[in-house]
Amino acid sequence: MYDVSTRKRALALVAQGRSLNSVSRETGISRAAMRSWHARLEPLPRMAVPPPGPPTDEVSYSYLLGLYLGDGCISAHPRGPGHYLRVACANSWPGLIDACEAAMRSVNPSGNAYRVQAQGYVSVVGYYPHWPHLFPQHGPGKKHERRIALAPWQQAIVDAHPWEFIRGLIHSDGCRITNWATRLVGGERKRYEYPRYFFTNLSGDIIRLFTTTLDHVGVDWRQANPRNISIARKASVALMDTHVGPKH
């Protein structure tokens, strides 16, 4: 189903004297569709896809929102209506790829999601006409170069499901690592290991969304520099291990 502006552009090309074959090759629109638009330009009401309300699967949405803010983007279909949501996932984490695809299928009203292999990573892709309604943070340019804020209905979902949001952000732009140190005990040097979580993002707004949600669930954090958050206290790492865990 094509929106009215797409239909008008196609018919304008035909009005320039071009053949239906020529316009069809350029736009990907069938000749039959263009012929039908001469009789009726407006789409039938039953064919129109209405903008969605808030997603019903809030758990999956909160996780997918975190993934989108970290490694996701939305782009318009090059020749027709609708948009693609893409989330880049490293090949190293097949479990993350599975979780991303499952969340996208659940959130997408059409249930559509598939994978595109690239060098070193997989793009999980879903097509849907109204992705920008579900992710109003979409806009021109890079996320860290524009303001990022949650809509009230998004904030309500994150407040209800904070750990899923944190997990999505960690899975996209975070990691769990193990540091170590040595000390002398009774004249013998012993090695001690301790895990910690890191989150890195160039957007100060996304950093604040992350740390505000950490505060909400009682996780202590430290800002090492403007784009890095460290979680190292034992109790907080234990909380993160319970609800997030390492990528796999």
Q: For the regions a protein language model found, what residue spans apply to each?
A:
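Internal intein/HINT superfamily modules and their associated LAGLIDADG
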Residues: 1-248
